[in-house]
């Protein structure tokens, strides 16, 4: 009788271990699937790290170092955001910047890969002027402004920095300019005029061609 009880104990213990291992395996699989969905969602966006700085704070025991990262995130189709992350390690600072940028998303009105009208944005000492450009011009802009424009999906534009060359100021001035953009319909409604009186004929023609091309591509798909 004793032998039977002793021989049965290890079998039960082994079964409980198998159950625990199976539970851990199922949890790991769920985490892997959840991580895969998160990675797929993040991969749909363009990310640009504009600048990384090391900052120090004097404390009682000496200096404490950390890193800051200025990050631009966009979908390349008119949606863009800017984030600023701070952490003890560079990857963590970038990750925080990405999360903040996605919380700050805003929509940029575009027509055929360029902006709807000239605009100038200011933030602190940064001043950035943006002008529409014809197809094939490309993004004529400095590094900091270029990162914002490319993530927003602008393909043809003329940009010039008129103020501070500090990357943070340039980025925020570029964002301020983009947030001032309006669609021709909005301008026409505000002025109480037909859209043909407030938008150049070339812009309206380009918008019509772009819409027709998009509709044709959708029908083939």
Curated annotation (Swiss-Prot):
One of its GO terms (biological process) is translation. One of its GO terms (molecular function) is rRNA binding. The keyword RNA-binding applies. Residues 18-40 have a biased composition (Basic and acidic residues). Residues 45-108 form the S5 DRBM domain. InterPro entries: Ribosomal_Su5_D2-typ_SF, Ribosomal_uS5, Ribosomal_uS5_bac-type, Ribosomal_uS5_C, Ribosomal_uS5_N, Ribosomal_uS5_N_CS, Ribsml_uS5_D2-typ_fold_subgr. Pfam families: Ribosomal_S5 (PF00333), Ribosomal_S5_C (PF03719). The N-terminal domain interacts with the head of the 30S subunit; the C-terminal domain interacts with the body and contacts protein S4. The interaction surface between S4 and S5 is involved in control of translational fidelity. With S4 and S12 plays an important role in translational accuracy. Part of the 30S ribosomal subunit. Contacts proteins S4 and S8. Belongs to the universal ribosomal protein uS5 family. This is Small ribosomal subunit protein uS5. The gene is rpsE.
């Amino acid at each position: 009788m004793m032998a039977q009880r002793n021989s049965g104990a290890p079998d039960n213990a082994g079964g409980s271990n198998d159950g625990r291992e199976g539970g851990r395996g199922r949890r790991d699989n769920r985490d892997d699937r959840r991580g895969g969905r998160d990675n797929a969602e993040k991969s749909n966006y363009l990310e640009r790290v504009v600048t990384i700085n090391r900052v120090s704070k004097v404390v009682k025991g000496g200096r404490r170092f950390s890193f800051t990262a200025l990050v631009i995130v966009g979908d390349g189709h008119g949606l863009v955001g800017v984030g600023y992350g701070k952490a003890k390690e560079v990857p963590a600072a970038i990750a925080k910047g990405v999360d903040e940028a996605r919380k700050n998303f805003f929509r940029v009105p575009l027509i055929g890969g360029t902006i709807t009208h000239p605009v100038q944005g200011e933030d602190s000492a940064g001043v950035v002027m943006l002008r529409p450009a014809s197809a094939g011009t490309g993004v004529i802009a400095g590094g900091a402004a270029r990162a914002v424009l490319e993530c927003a999906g602008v393909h043809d534009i003329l940009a010039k920095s008129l103020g501070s060359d500090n990357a943070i100021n340039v980025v925020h001035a570029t964002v301020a300019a983009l947030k001032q953009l309006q669609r021709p319909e909005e301008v026409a409604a505000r002025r109480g005029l037909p859209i043909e009186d407030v938008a150049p004929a070339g812009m309206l023609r380009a918008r019509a061609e772009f819409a027709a091309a998009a509709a044709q591509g959708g029908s083939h798909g």
